[in-house]
């Protein structure tokens, strides 16, 4: 590498941001060094391969336009409960679709690349509250060991650009964007049109060789912007998750009772009595 000088590495406490400045007479050499620093930080990041929760707090300016409160993008390690193969209460159809559209993209990446298949997908999980959408996301995290899984929800979805930039830095990665209808509603009722446009641009901007998938969840698919859910290049599979069938209820109830003395419990009667109940209802039953 040609001669370069790292002029300054600073961290600003107020904004919680780091800055690298490089002074060099040769622009290409400076860029080469900067790229090397980014690559090393990417490969050695403490966040790589873990389950993360991303949160964003918007900034605030005073009446004179000065920053009163800086925007903050925070990253914490997620403590979601692991879901193993023994815990699965999804249907075979759901498992097959998740395997084909998400898991195989990471476990069979080399084969897909050899055959020119893009290793990125968008999947939308939709259905009433409490029907297992978050459970399915946790299952994917369990199956994708070594993949960076990032959970984003609520107002944090407003900072789409930073979310996707972080995913690119730590790929292979899966972005779990939860309750997306709250921010990315149809244009007629959307109060966050800028964020909606950013999401569409980011999903369209994923390159074929970028190993990033996006899993969206919503309780109200009718509210969700059509440009997200109806565009194959953005969403490759919409998966409806309704109230569990008898077989899934039986398995779910058995799991809930496995650490208790349930010898006197009639599981089959519980299955019959719980027709139409969601997993969330069964858990509190």
What are these regions (language model features)?
Residues 1-109, 120, 155:
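AAA+ P-loop ATPase mechanoenzymes
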Residues 124, 274-285:
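The conserved phosphate-sensing helix
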Residues 27, 31, 222, 246-247, ...:
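Loop/helix-junction capping segments adjacent to catalytic residues or to phosphate/diphosphate-binding pockets
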Residues 29-37, 163, 252, 285:
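Hydrophobic side chains in well-ordered alpha-helices
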Residues 84-270:
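Walker A/P-loop NTP-binding motif of AAA+ ATPase domains
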